[in-house]
Design a protein with these regions (language model features):
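Short, cysteine-centered beta-strand-loop-beta hairpins and adjacent loop/turn segments enriched
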Residues: 70-72
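Short, conserved secondary-structure transition motifs
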Residues: 101-109
Length: 109
């Protein structure tokens, strides 16, 4: 079940995925549509997960789950990786490369 990102408790579990390039407007639309559908239907052990997502600085996708509502399991986390692979393939940007390091220099990331 999707909730507003700002309503997710601070103690929630989060994953931050970074892109190898800035998201275009089209990328953001695709990410929003796919992520919206995903978090609205995301489940663990046949129980709804209270989840949300946010795009930050046109380069990061943040996914959050309120584990106080229902705990997340390994299969559900794996399912989220399928979403990331799908988004990466669709927008032709790598969101799963752990060797990418982003940093801020002034207002530039």
């Amino acid at each position: 079940m999707k909730v507003e990102f700002d309503k997710i408790p601070d103690e929630s579990r989060i994953w931050i995925y970074q892109s190898n390039d800035d998201f275009t407007e089209s990328d953001v639309d695709i990410i929003n549509k796919k992520s919206d559908l995903f978090v609205d239907n995301w489940m663990a052990h046949n129980k709804e997960l209270q989840a949300s997502f946010k795009i930050l600085n046109n380069r990061f996708l943040v996914i959050a789950v309120n584990e106080e509502f229902n705990p997340i399991g390994g299969c559900s986390i794996d399912y989220s990786l399928q979403l990331l692979k799908d988004i990466s393939d669709t927008i032709n940007k790598n969101l799963l490369d752990r060797l990418i390091v982003n940093y801020r220099m002034g207002s530039i990331i």
